């Protein structure tokens, strides 16, 4: 009997976290060397403040595209107020623009899928005739553009689901009446992939990857007989016969 694989997208099939890191590095450079030199705070202070503000904004703005650049604006305003430095609307506009670098379509195209992803997806579809489902969390507009840019629809067809939050109920809705003993979720986040998949009663392939601070709040990997940890996505192909 064929298997069903429910794949996460960000940092499972395609790189994501480093897009945000790229924007953060440019933000640090702009603040320290262009705007506030020689009165700029320590680099670590700036990044810690930005992460703290961004984590708080998740509670009110969720995973919308606007949250990340808005956090840059708020970080810059906070630093300026603390240092008694004036700022203007042009500064805030620039901070927002830097935050938007995390959503650069050209970078998505350049980076493409993670190493081994295409080979693995081809194998599952062409060789094993398995069913593939894509379940991704985030801003609908951004996720649609990412998936289109990396041409993922050729493997997943219409079985592509984009949700604002991923939990056990969402996974159960996607699984439907399928035999859960034949369903595997594949993802990189303990919080957004491992925990909800195990709670939903399906099997889990965990592929660790660097995640952002909000996801790391719940990073302890649970012990469960339905959980397998691979280091690279290609191991799904190479160790396929062990997935029982």
Regions found by a protein language model. Give the residues of each.
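Asp-based, Mg2+/Mn2+-dependent phosphohydrolase catalytic module
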Residues: 1-3, 118, 122, 138-244
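Active-site neighborhood of HAD-like aspartate-dependent phosphohydrolases
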Residues: 1-48
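An amphipathic alpha-helix signature
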Residues: 20-29, 69, 73, 77, ...
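Alpha-helix N-cap/helix-initiation sites
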Residues: 20-21, 39, 43, 62-69, ...
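Short, surface-exposed acidic
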Residues: 33-50, 81-96, 154-159
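A metal-dependent, Asp-based hydrolase signature
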Residues: 51-105
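Substrate-recognition element of Asp-dependent hydrolases with the DxDx(T/V) motif
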Residues: 90-150, 161-162
């Amino acid at each position: 009997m064929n298997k069903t694989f429910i794949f996460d997208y960000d940092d499972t099939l395609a790189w994501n976290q480093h897009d945000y890191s790229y924007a953060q590095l440019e933000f640090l450079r702009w603040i320290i060397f262009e705007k506030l030199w020689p009165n700029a705070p320590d680099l670590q202070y700036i990044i810690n403040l930005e992460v703290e503000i961004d984590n708080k904004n998740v509670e009110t703005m969720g995973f919308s595209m606007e949250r990340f650049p808005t956090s840059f604006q708020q970080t810059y305003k906070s630093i300026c107020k603390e240092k008694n430095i004036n700022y203007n609307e042009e500064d805030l506009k620039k901070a927002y623009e830097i935050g938007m670098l995390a959503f650069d379509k050209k970078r998505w195209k350049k980076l493409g899928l993670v190493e081994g992803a295409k080979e693995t997806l081809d194998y599952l579809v062409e060789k094993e005739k398995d069913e593939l489902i894509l379940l991704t969390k985030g801003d609908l507009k951004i996720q649609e553009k990412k998936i289109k840019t990396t041409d993922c629809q050729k493997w997943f067809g219409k079985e592509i689901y984009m949700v604002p939050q991923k939990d056990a109920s969402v996974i159960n809705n996607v699984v439907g009446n399928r035999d859960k003993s034949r369903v595997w979720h594949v993802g990189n986040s303990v919080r957004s992939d491992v925990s909800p998949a195990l709670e939903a009663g399906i099997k889990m392939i965990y592929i660790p990857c660097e995640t952002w601070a909000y996801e790391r709040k719940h990073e302890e990997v649970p012990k469960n007989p339905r959980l397998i940890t691979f280091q690279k996505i290609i191991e799904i192909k190479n160790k396929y016969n062990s997935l029982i």
